[in-house]
């Protein structure tokens, strides 16, 4: 097996319009493609994150909630590399997003913090190494 990289991360949201606005307008991800599948009553939104990375945002009628606290099995969080965590936190807070206090990774010495998407999915901002 010759795995090169992660191709995409798929997220199922409860409110498509709200989540689309969050990821495109608030976080600034670029829309690659948007498809509505009538037979599934479902949208699929392909978003570009940086260069060569994608998030697929899906909507389904009445998706079941996934427990995430306390530390349920499965995806724990999705992390985004940023050049300046403090600046990114300020931008999010100016847009009304609640952000946890900035912490220092004891293993790398890098700054990081967490916030959540509209469905409560934990998202991390991790400062790129210098």
Where are these regions (language model features)?
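Acetyl-CoA-dependent GNAT
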Residues: 59-63, 127-130
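Exposed loop/turn and edge beta-strand positions of beta-sandwich/beta-sheet ligand-binding modules
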Residues: 5, 41-43, 74, 109
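N-terminal beta-strand motif that seeds the catalytic metal site of vicinal oxygen chelate
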Residues: 1-18, 75-80, 129-130
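Vicinal oxygen chelate
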Residues: 1-2, 35, 46, 89-130
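Core segments of cupin and vicinal oxygen chelate
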Residues: 12-53, 94
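A short, acidic/glycine-rich surface segment
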Residues: 32-33, 40-43, 62-68, 101
């Amino acid at each position: 097996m010759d795995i090169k990289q992660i191709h995409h991360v798929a997220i199922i949201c409860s409110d498509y319009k709200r989540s689309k606005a969050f990821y495109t307008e608030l976080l600034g991800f670029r829309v690659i493609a948007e498809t509505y599948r009538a037979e599934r009553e479902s949208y699929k939104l392909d978003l570009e994150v940086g260069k060569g990375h994608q998030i697929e945002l899906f909507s389904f009628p009445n998706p079941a909630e996934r427990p995430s606290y306390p530390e349920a099995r499965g995806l724990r969080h999705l992390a985004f590399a940023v050049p300046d965590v403090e600046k990114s936190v300020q931008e999010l807070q100016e847009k009304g997003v609640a952000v946890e206090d900035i912490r220092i990774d004891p293993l790398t010495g890098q700054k990081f913090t967490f916030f959540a998407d509209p469905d409560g999915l934990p998202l991390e901002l991790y400062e790129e190494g210098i």
